[in-house]
From Swiss-Prot:
InterPro entries: Elong-fact-P_C, NA-bd_OB-fold, Rib_uL2_dom2, Transl_elong_fac_P/YeiP, Transl_elong_KOW-like, Transl_elong_p-like_YeiP, Transl_elong_P/YeiP_cen, Transl_elong_P/YeiP_CS. CDD domains: S1_EF-P_repeat_1 (cd04470). PANTHER family: ELONGATION FACTOR P (PTHR30053), TRANSLATION ELONGATION FACTOR KOW-LIKE DOMAIN-CONTAINING PROTEIN (PTHR30053:SF14). It comes from the Bacteria. SMART domains: EFP, Elong-fact-P_C. Gene3D superfamilies: 2.30.30.30, Nucleic acid-binding proteins. This is Elongation factor P-like protein.
Length: 190
């Protein structure tokens, strides 16, 4: 059991007799005094795959589920299925493309370290990515000389197809670090 303000992205909750995977959380702070903060959560139903949206007050109690986490590595694509191998016992985990469509925007062609498969009671629930990823910019407007003092952004397309705003001084071919949960530019990659 946890309060709504303690729920994070990637957690699984039991709500209305449904297992729901938290995909996104919007926090809405009221302007009136005494009003409680609202948490608008978008879920994916684990059993049906349907999208569900619910609102909670910050002190609402929600039943959370403890998940088993296994570290995996992206292996190969088989039709519309993506195969990930367990790093310890090499067991394959299969995901349909529509199950992990959001996550695929952050996984580079050669894979990335830190990917985990979440399971509960032997059932595969989701794929969890690390907090950051380094990706290469493949398309953006040319860098503007002297734009380093500017705080303006421009859209940039990454090697995976992801489009995020980046500072004006960056150009195509540069590797940048992206914060996955917020989909934002963090800095140049090492």
């Amino acid at each position: 059991m946890a309060r709504a303000n303690e729920i994070k992205r990637g957690m699984v909750v039991n709500y209305n007799d449904k297992l729901l995977l938290v995909k996104d959380i919007d926090v809405q702070s009221p302007s009136a005094r005494g009003a409680s903060t609202l948490y608008k959560m978008r879920f994916s139903d684990v059993r049906t795959g349907l999208k569900v949206e619910e609102r909670f007050k910050g002190d609402d109690i929600i039943d959370t589920i403890t998940l088993t986490r296994r570290t995996v590595t992206f292996s190969y694509i088989d039709g519309d299925e993506y195969v990930f191998m367990d790093d310890e016992d090499y067991a394959p985990y299969l995901f349909k493309k529509d199950q992990i469509e959001e996550e695929l925007l952050f996984i580079p062609e050669g894979g990335m370290p830190g990917i985990q498969v979440l399971s509960w009671d032997g059932q595969i629930i989701a794929l969890e990515l690390p907090q950051t990823v380094d990706l290469e910019i493949i398309e953006t407007a040319p860098g503007i000389k002297g734009a380093s003092a500017s705080s303006r952004n421009k859209p940039a397309t990454m090697s995976t197809g992801l489009v995020i705003p980046v500072p004006e001084y960056l150009s195509a071919g540069e590797k940048i670090r992206i914060h996955i949960p917020e989909r934002r530019y963090m800095g140049r990659a090492d």
